[in-house]
Amino acid sequence: GQTSSYRGNAVSFMPEYSFHWHGQSEKLYLFEAPIDMLSFISMHKENWRDHSYAAACCISSRVMYQMMKDNPNIQKVYLCLDNDFAGEIGSKRISEELLQKGIDYEILIPTRKDWNEDRQAACANAPHKSAEFPISEESEDQLCPVLQL
């Protein structure tokens, strides 16, 4: 088989219905990619189910407007795009749209390139607990049986 480095959306992709979570609060968090959305939630777990989240799978605002249409409770949008040139341009463009429509917004910028890199860095710096029991080769074989055909 061939490997491909293509990273993009399928032709049939409908950006207004991309990866998302509908909460009931007045807050919507918009991300570029699903992994960044999930990373952000994993770092901000408190009451996460209450809020709405969407991954545009690019720097489009279509999913944001669909989420606002589906949940009229949304009063504030948090733009959580990547900390790179495309994310900066996207945040500027979308914030101008929101400003023109009179919608409250805030721009949240990850420390590193994106929220997943921030999460990875936070995990790397977290203290790790060592195993408190030895694993012998015999017990490892019992834990991880190998299927031989």
Q: Language-model features: where?
A:
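TOPRIM fold recognition
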Residues: S42-L149
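Phosphate-handling DNA/RNA-contact segment within nucleic-acid enzymes
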Residues: G1-D70
